């Protein structure tokens, strides 16, 4: 048996029904991976993923917030230099006599902060939300285009 994982799909361990380590079994320590405040029920929303890209014109932030409404999300500028994206999602719990087999939708609060560079226009920040993706655009200050300067030097002698 090889201890090196296969990156090409030839991992014999995962295909063997006789290998006890390849079976999906109950793991008594699985619940210890997260503190109780970050249980599986809330961890997806508390770990909101954000991409930050810089273009020639702006800094663009994209946050995946599946299932959230724009009313549940706040975009703020703190201290004229920090972009804060936060929100909270509540899951409506039905108290019926139904038998639940799995509950995986997440709820809870999240907050992400990003220190912005000095070359941005804080008063022109825009945010939009479409299909569970929040896009925040922070325009950059146009830098004065440097003109090529030519200075003639007198030659003495």
Swiss-Prot record:
GO terms for biological process: cellular response to hypoxia; response to heat; response to oxidative stress. Residues 41-156 form the sHSP domain. Expressed ubiquitously at low levels under normal physiological conditions. Gene3D superfamilies: 2.60.40.790. It is found in: Cytoplasm. Coiled coil: none annotated. Induction: Accumulates after heat shock. Keywords: Cytoplasm, Stress response. InterPro entries: A-crystallin/Hsp20_dom, CS_dom, HSP20-like_chaperone, Small_HSP. Disruption phenotype: Reduction of OEP7 targeting to plastids. It comes from the Eukaryota. GO terms for cellular component: cytoplasm. Homodimer under normal physiological conditions. Aggregates in high oligomeric complexes after heat shock. Binds to AKR2A and to chloroplasts. Cytosolic mediator for sorting and targeting of nascent chloroplast outer envelope membrane (OEM) proteins to the chloroplast. Functions as an AKR2A cofactor to facilitate the targeting of OEP7 to chloroplasts. Belongs to the small heat shock protein (HSP20) family. This is 17.8 kDa class I heat shock protein. The gene is HSP17.8.
């Amino acid at each position: 048996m090889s201890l090196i994982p296969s990156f090409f799909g030839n991992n014999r361990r995962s295909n063997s029904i006789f290998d006890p380590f390849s079976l999906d079994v109950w793991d008594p320590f699985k619940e210890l991976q997260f503190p109780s405040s970050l249980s599986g029920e809330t961890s997806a929303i508390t770990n909101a993923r954000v991409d930050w890209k810089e273009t020639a014109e702006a800094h663009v932030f994209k946050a995946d917030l599946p299932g959230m409404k724009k009313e549940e999300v706040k975009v703020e500028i703190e201290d004229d230099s920090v972009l804060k994206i936060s929100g909270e999602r509540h899951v409506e719990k039905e108290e019926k006599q139904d038998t639940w087999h799995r509950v995986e939708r997440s709820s809870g609060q999240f907050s992400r902060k990003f220190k912005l560079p000095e070359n941005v226009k804080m008063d022109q920040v825009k945010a939009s939300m479409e299909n569970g993706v929040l896009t925040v655009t922070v325009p950059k200050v146009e830098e004065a285009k440097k003109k090529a300067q030519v200075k003639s030097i007198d030659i003495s002698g």
